[in-house]
């Protein structure tokens, strides 16, 4: 394996998401937040990445602190975690294709983030806040959008990495959510070109696709993971995993179509989401870790924020037991 089948980093929402509630970020006390960080440190989390909701986090007061991001990065300092932050962007960037306006907005966010937080010792990089898999009609726009964002970040903080986290859509018997059906070779060719042109430092691949469905297993996902890893290896880009710990619980593509329609969307049914069962999470980590040098986990939070609810507390304990049995060196007292 390229790395241990464990999570050593988390991606955290400050804005709306399909699974966790954003409100807890703003209503929890400083004491509860510190306990969250201690819980993450205990299970070996070394990287903390903020993505959705960064502009909101810079302006909305929270119970823990007037500036919740300042509080979070200070906790990263305390816990010796690397802090990585999204560049921000227009909420409807995928609908409103205006490069000058978009880059003006991103530059304003990057400038403000740098002014407020870059002096912290944990400040360790940037996350490109544009997630997609394959978009052929908008391909040149996206190539330029990525390239200009990477250049902007590297001008602001030379030497710090810029990270992106695309996804893939595994084939299903019906075209769920109109994601399209594409072979691994298409992803390899598309992202080889994207990486060569835009030059991000790290690609952290989401491991269960834009559909986030619970029935995807190794035989479906691994060819896509291998294709992205190959594109990274050939384009001087480090390959990380983004192993998702929440999923939309459904048994098959046919069941999804019958219940929600082919054009239904998983974000419309938050009640169906669940923490990934621990045996399935282990399989997901093992597949990704054959290729990745490190594994993040996208921002559902149940396996690393036990304060969220009872299901999250159970998931956290399950993962803690997994580490105790298989990788006890990851646990920190």
What name fits each language-model region?
Residues 48-49, 200-214, 231-333:
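Substrate-binding cleft of secreted/luminal carbohydrate-active enzymes
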Residues 6-15, 83-104, 127-131, 146-185, ...:
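Aromatic-lined carbohydrate-recognition surfaces of secreted/lumenal glycan-active proteins
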Residues 5-9, 25-56, 75, 193-204, ...:
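Catalytic domains of carbohydrate-active enzymes, especially glycoside hydrolases
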Residues 3-25, 35-43, 221, 225, ...:
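Ligand-binding pocket scaffold of soluble enzyme catalytic domains
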Residues 65-79, 97-125, 145, 152, ...:
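An active-site-proximal structural segment forming one wall of the substrate-binding cleft
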Residues 10-32, 95-103, 175-184, 256-280:
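Active-site mouth loops of central-metabolism enzymes
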Residues 27-92, 138-163, 215-234, 314-315, ...:
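Aromatic-lined substrate-binding rim segments of carbohydrate-active enzymes
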Residues 90, 109-140, 201-209, 295:
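Active-site groove signature of glycoside hydrolases
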């Amino acid at each position: 394996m390229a790395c241990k089948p464990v999570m050593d980093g988390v991606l955290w929402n400050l804005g709306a998401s399909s699974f966790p509630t954003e409100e807890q970020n703003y209503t929890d006390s400083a004491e509860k937040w510190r306990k969250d960080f201690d819980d993450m440190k205990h299970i070996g989390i070394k990287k903390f990445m903020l993505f959705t909701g960064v502009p909101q986090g810079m302006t909305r007061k929270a119970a823990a602190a007037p500036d919740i991001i300042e509080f979070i990065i200070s906790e990263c300092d305390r816990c010796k975690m690397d802090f990585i932050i999204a560049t921000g962007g227009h909420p409807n960037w995928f609908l409103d294709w205006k490069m000058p306006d978009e880059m003006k907005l991103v530059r304003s966010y990057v400038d403000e983030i740098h002014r407020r937080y870059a002096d912290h010792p944990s400040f360790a990089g940037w996350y490109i806040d544009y997630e997609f898999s394959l978009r052929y009609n908008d391909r040149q726009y996206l190539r330029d959008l990525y390239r200009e964002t990477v250049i902007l970040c590297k001008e602001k903080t030379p030497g710090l990495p810029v990270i992106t986290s695309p996804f893939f859509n595994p084939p299903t018997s019906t075209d769920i959510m109109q994601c399209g059906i594409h072979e691994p070779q298409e992803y390899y060719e598309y992202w080889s070109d994207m990486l060569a042109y835009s030059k991000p430092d790290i690609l952290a691949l989401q491991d269960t696709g834009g559909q986030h469905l619970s029935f995807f297993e190794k035989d479906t996902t691994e060819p896509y993971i291998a294709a992205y890893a190959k594109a990274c290896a050939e384009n001087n880009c480090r390959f990380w995993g983004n192993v998702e710990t929440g999923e939309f619980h459904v048994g098959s593509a046919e069941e999804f179509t019958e219940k929600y329609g082919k054009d239904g969307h998983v974000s419309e049914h938050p009640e169906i989401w669940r923490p990934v069962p621990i045996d399935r999470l282990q399989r997901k980590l093992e597949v990704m870790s054959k290729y990745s040098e490190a594994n993040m986990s996208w921002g559902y939070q149940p396996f690393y924020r036990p304060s969220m609810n009872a299901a999250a507390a159970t998931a956290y304990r399950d993962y803690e037991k997994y580490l105790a049995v298989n990788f006890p060196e990851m646990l920190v007292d």
